[in-house]
UniProtKB/Swiss-Prot annotation:
Protein's recorded name: UDP-N-acetylenolpyruvoylglucosamine reductase
Localization (cell): Cytoplasm
Biological function: Cell wall formation.
The keyword Nucleus appears for this protein: no
Tree of life domain: Bacteria
Gene name, Swiss-Prot/TrEMBL: murB
Primary localization: cytoplasm
Organism of provenance: Methylorubrum populi (strain ATCC BAA-705 / NCIMB 13946 / BJ001)
Molecular function via GO: FAD binding; UDP-N-acetylmuramate dehydrogenase activity
Keyword annotations: Cell cycle, Cell division, Cell shape, Cell wall biogenesis/degradation, Cytoplasm, FAD, Flavoprotein, NADP, Oxidoreductase, Peptidoglycan synthesis
Amino acid sequence: MTAHSLIDDIRAAAPDLRGRLLENQSLSDLTWFRVGGPAQVLFSPADEEDLAAFLAALDPSVPVTVIGLGSNLIVRDGGIPGVTIRLGGKAFGSVEIDGETIRAGTAVPDMRLAKAAAEASLDGLAFFRGIPGSVGGALRMNAGAHGGETTDVLTEARGIDRNGAVRSFTHAEMGFRYRHSSAPDDVIFTSATFRGRPGDREGIEAEMERVTAAREAAQPIRERTGGSTFKNPKGGKAWQLIDAAGCRGLIRGGAQVSEMHCNFLINRGGATAADIEGLGEEVRRRVREHSGFELHWEIKRIGVESSEG
């Protein structure tokens, strides 16, 4: 099925869609690495109702991929077949606060969530200041930093499943563990509810400043990077294992292991997704041979490899 026929089929099945529907849309500008091929079809729904109608009408055989801010992501050079969904706009990007409860759309950047909580003098969410992703990604991988994790503050998540049905998940139903959630893979999260605790605004903002300073001092945040590349294995720290295996500064094509922080890969300029993923696999191989530790990707890799070359 060609991109043209797929988008025509979608328009025929769901003629009343209000969101933006594009074909053969480049995704490289939507990822922090600035690499990757096109989406066969890219859909940006107008709101939750629009998303539900889209999924209900979509042929079940069409694969669906969801992307957020693109900070923890490698889109392979061959692009993403089927439909790629990206949430954005006011419908998915608002934050509402009622007492100690914070409700945020899943397109809200984690850093903005932390700022909103601080402005409401709600403590417990300052760690989000150190996470360069969105609320949706935080739900999917139990994102955390500086001693805090999503599981510590989430009370409920809401989303749409592949059939277009609205689903709600309690904290227990999310099944959080280290950098993982057991929520069904086909659910596209649309909002989340968090609970903070009353605190001192100045103290919370000071903590956020400390988080920011620590991140800037230790991580290559000015580079084109996807964030932490590998999960910390039990009994070790990824960056130390990578450094001990002699991988600091290692280069493959336009990709490099950061000199500043070994658990970050960077696009030096002109890198392909294959360069970055291939470098990561080489790092995994060297760490395995040097220490016996098996590193597992924290960065999500999606799409198909390029057929060129």
